């Protein structure tokens, strides 16, 4: 039987003064124990943080610590021309992001207005 793919994980995700308890090591180790062999985690930039800075931060958290294959989605938490320009860069082969999430909830935290 092939392994599963979890397309919606939040390892070490900061949120409202806390962060999710699983890091990339414990989360992917648990995933493997349950038969999941790949995860896709959300990169969530802080307000004002560039997409590329956030991507690099997530890669630093994950690389060398994951126990299975992984990829990344990108959340867009604020909007300006720099973000629009970075979206095309982040889709390049260098970064490999090919999906974005924009929030319609969490006003004053993630919601795009």
Residue ranges and their predicted role:
Residues 44-56, 61-113:
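Histidine/acidic-residue-rich, glycine-tolerant segments that coordinate divalent metal ions
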Residues 1-65:
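Metal-associated gating/positioning segment near the N- to mid-region
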């Amino acid at each position: 039987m092939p392994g599963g793919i979890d397309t919606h994980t939040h390892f070490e995700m900061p949120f409202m003064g806390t962060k999710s308890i699983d890091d990339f090591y414990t989360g992917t180790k648990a995933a493997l124990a349950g038969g999941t062999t790949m995860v896709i985690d959300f990169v969530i930039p802080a307000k004002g943080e560039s997409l590329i800075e956030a991507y690099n931060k997530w890669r630093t958290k994950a690389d060398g610590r994951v126990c299975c294959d992984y990829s990344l989605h990108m959340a867009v938490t604020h909007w300006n021309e720099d973000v629009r320009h970075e979206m095309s860069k982040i889709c390049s082969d260098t970064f490999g992001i090919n999906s974005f999430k924009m929030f319609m909830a969490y006003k004053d935290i993630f919601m795009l207005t």
